A protein has these predicted regions:
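S-adenosyl-L-methionine
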Residues: 1-77
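SAM cofactor-binding core of SAM-dependent methyltransferases
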Residues: 64-101
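Short "lid" loop at the C-terminus of a central beta-strand within the Rossmann-like core
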Residues: 72, 118-119, 155-159
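Glycine/Thr-rich phosphate-binding loops of Rossmann-like dinucleotide-binding domains
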Residues: 76-77, 122, 159-160
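A short acidic, Gly/Pro-enriched loop at the edge of an enzyme's catalytic core
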Residues: 99-113
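Mobile active-site "lid"/loop adjacent to the S-adenosyl-L-methionine
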Residues: 111-138
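Conserved Class I SAM-dependent methyltransferase catalytic core
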Residues: 132-185
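Core SAM-dependent methyltransferase catalytic element
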Residues: 175-216
Length: 216
């Protein structure tokens, strides 16, 4: 599915104004203004803001196997899928460390939604250590080529540019006195070993500006 189609789906399904655009480099950029609806359906600390999952789902209407990483008490009614959390009491599909994901069959998923702790203070609220973002991205390299990772954070995680392409960067703001966050959409690339020789010679997966981002 091309990004022009994804943006059309977003506008059609959400009814929001067109706020995402395809830049000259082929990457999607834009802003989501979430408004002053402070509700988090689960009442769980750090839960997704109202309407976030609906927006993401509208961008990926064809995805059938979603995985919620750092899932907490994610609203599966808004976005069905399996869950991963290190806290067993939350009853996730997989009790696992997001930095290794050893128990998760990542190759069976075509979309991963990640919302890690943003700071040491946030991690303390969850009674966990601060996550190493580059380790999470390394574990996600086991995804099948073409799978997407939707990463909500205040930081762009380090990643390998031969493993992932940045398809979209979306600024997200709720209202005054709230943290400004960024939604980064990664696409898993095929490795050289997975590409036929002809495809390898013609490979155009990497955006021209991708070299501007650091690798893990």
């Amino acid at each position: 599915m091309e990004w022009a189609e994804r943006i059309d789906s977003y506008v059609r399904q959400t009814g929001f104004p067109r706020s995402l655009f395809i830049g000259e480099d082929g990457r999607v950029v834009g802003t989501w203004i979430m408004g002053n609806d402070y509700r988090v359906k689960s009442a769980y600390y750090g839960g997704y803001p109202a309407g976030y999952l609906r927006r993401v789902r509208a961008l990926f209407p064809e995805k059938r196997r979603a995985l919620h990483l750092f899932s907490g008490k994610v609203d599966l009614g808004a976005f069905p899928g399996d869950t991963v959390d290190i806290n067993r009491s939350l009853e996730p599909t997989y009790v696992d460390d997001a930095q290794t994901l050893e128990r998760v069959p990542l190759e069976t998923y075509d979309l991963v939604l990640a919302d890690p702790p943003y700071s040491v203070e946030d991690a303390d609220r969850y009674q966990t250590t601060m996550v190493k973002r580059n380790s999470v991205m390394r574990a996600l390299q086991r995804l099948t080529p073409g799978a997407h990772v939707v990463w909500l954070d205040q930081v762009l995680p380090m990643y390998r540019k031969d493993a992932f392409a940045v398809d979209a960067v979306i600024g997200m703001v709720k209202s005054t006195n709230h943290r400004f966050r960024v939604v980064t959409v990664f696409r898993r690339l095929a490795t050289s070993a997975e590409l036929p020789a002809k495809k390898l010679a013609q490979r155009t997966d990497e955006h021209p500006l991708q070299a501007a981002f650091k690798t893990a």
